[in-house]
Amino acid sequence: MSEQKLKIGITQGDPNGIGWEVILKALADPRMTELFTPVIYGSPKAAAYYRNTLRETEPVQFAPAASAAEARRGKIALVAAGEVEQPEPGRATAEAGRAAVEALRAAVRDLKAGELDAVVTGPFDKETVQSDEFSYTGHTEYFGAELEGEPMMIMCSDRLRVGLVTKHIPVSEIARSISKEKIVRDLATLRRSLVEDFGVVEPRIAVMALNPHAGDGGLVGREEEETIRPAIVEAFGQGILAFGPFAADGLFAGGGYTRYDGILAMYHDQGLAPFKTLSPDGVNFTAGLAAVRTSPDHGVAFDIAGKDQADPQSMRNAIYAAIDIVRHRRARAEWTANPLQRAEREKSNRDVSVKDLPQTDKE
């Protein structure tokens, strides 16, 4: 990238949901364009429609662009993609699903071309986006198919980072989808992300159990003894500071999670329910990929769409997180490419034990 400011792509999501509202509210502050160059992918007609529904938000002015390559510093670029004739707030329609996918594909096209530094995705409706050409159960799976790497869904905030072993699958399939090998791989991915994406020096990871009371020694399920604990032992042998398995209720209710830099949950709701309770304005980050993708941690919220009631803070945080992660990756790449700088760092840390290292990200 030749420009100093990062170019961050933002997709409209479902034009009948709250995507446009939170985008417009988040970008209304002129300081945002001082921080980065926004490139919005979506329907100009939907943008104009929702701009007129916001009573107390400063109107956002767009600069039309054919792609992110035409985006300019100090301007909010709008790449026309996923056009709709007339938004229908609160309605789940095939037209809105198509528009969400078209905007997403345009952003990923520019991301893969190197014209964007990261992408922030607006929420779409998982049912209406389905078609013969798009059969993914979520953004995470789509980005995993389009970009290099094995994606991991990490929910993150200033106080908490939760990774998932399984994502968008039925509860009935969770137990058979968990294996020792997968948990070890996911622990490695989570550790690498905590180091490279969040700047944690020597991350400690809590691993959640699958069954109530962590299986009670096998009385309430054998997964802890036969799968999860052996995975933790193997990962620890590889230098990953993984601990557990911990019963979910005890880990969160007692505040034990604060002693760890990351948490690995076995399934979607096990991780997201406590995360959203503790961090209502958190961010969804897709780790394990060559490129950076984040999103707000809420859905389309059809019930309040078009009513000027949506809170933009999670969208703001998703933008901030994308910027921070890109900067962390570049800083680490620069450091690891400089042998003298790396040698000095290693020398200064030579006599430091694990217990002396920072246990949380202090930034």
Feature roles, as predicted:
Residues 155-185:
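Ligand-binding beta-strand-loop-alpha-helix segment within the catalytic cores
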Residues 142-157:
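FAD-binding core/adjacent interface of flavoenzyme oxidoreductases
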Residues 1-139, 181-266, 270-284, 289-300, ...:
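Contiguous, glycine/small-aliphatic-enriched amphipathic segments in soluble metabolic enzymes
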